[in-house]
Amino acid sequence: MKKIAIIGSGMMAKPVADYLLEVCNYEIIGVDQEVSKARNVIGDRSLGKAISLMIKDSYDLDPIVGEVDIVISMLPRPLHIHVAKSCLRHGKSMLTTSYQLPEVVALADEAKKKGILFLDEMGEDPGLDHMGTQMLLDEIRGEGGKAVDIKSYGCGLPAFEHNNNPMGYKFSWAPTGFFAAAKTGAAYYLKGKRIEVSGDQLFKHFRLVDIDGIGTFETYPNRDCKKYLELFGLTKDISFYRGLLRYPGYCNNMRYLGEIGLFDSKQMENFENVTYRQFTASLVGADAYKNDRKPEEKVAEFLNLDINADFIHRLKWLGFFEDRPIDIKKGTRLDVLLDRMLKKMSYEPHEKDMIIVHVEIIAEFPDKSGEKRLATMMMEGIPYSDSAMSRAVGLPVAIGTRMVLEGKINAVGAHIPPSLPGLYKPLLEELATHGFVFTKKTIPF
């Protein structure tokens, strides 16, 4: 019987364990710093075992990695390197759902010598977006066509009927990772020209996009497209954009939160006996009580907004103008924001999230005709059960793990889905049995 370690028991881990335990009948070791979290993922299933482990370096993982056949790391992205180093020592492959870490890529040659695979970007976005892109590219090329413009979008949002807060967002994945992504710069290509967007300009660089059959959203660029150009075999004159989708209003909300300093995660502060009102006034260099002007007015002036601007009302809804002590006593400004958001922007048990993965490719064909090819996946979460995001992230990496164990993926070294073009077809076929299907459409022009 195959044995798998799932390292990390965050919001995405349960569907991974469910698939490997119930569909594959594999033995699972769930590992987390807090054993209660690992138990929540494993449950009382006889093939599962929960273990508590504090991971300070790669050697802490050796007893577990040495015991299993393969490892799935669901840890925060920077920690994958510890897992990879332990896997190298023991000759075990590792899969993750995160963007590929340069430190792990640097181990590719050693992994090849050991005959093992480091397979990253096996989640929803990144992951399913790559597979949808590869699927359309293969179809276009199979008909003699050439892609000239690619747009790929992904998101996890409240389902339409549960988009019931003024921020237009709720947390279905770890908020620390959410804000790390919110500060990461991006780059895309417009007819071969590289457009770079720094992290502090990300939310100014948005536009509206209509997703066929679903609705209108804001999109802003998602990470750097550069490495995907070669992996997808794209020409230098391509237009290629990867973006995230959000409900309208989101980007300005995030922009202004950043501009008043709430994304600061570096400086620790003492919030003992500090009210939200005082804290918010201090963000814009004011005193909450020294004159007649309210903090709301001071924030609006700082941002050059009207006092009735949507953002001021949303900041008020989050509680930042309340005259009561801050709930956390010590932390960073970002910690204060996270605390308020998690209390106001979490899903109720009956509420549903939704994921959307949408790819649009404009193609030219030898007869001079042109087409826009669309592939769209949309799925809602299950009330009182798994979120759509947890399943869209967890199922691809779980299915990929089974494929590696069964010898259906024979690659070694460091890879992501675009560098393994034979991966997506069988994976998407099985994913369809779980309800995750790309709907395709062709628009001639």
Place the predicted regions along the sequence by residue.
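Rossmann-fold cofactor-recognition segment
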Residues: 45-58
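Conserved Rossmann-fold cofactor-binding substructure of NAD(P)-dependent oxidoreductases
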Residues: 55-67
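Rossmann-fold NAD(P)-binding glycine/threonine-rich loop
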Residues: 98-120
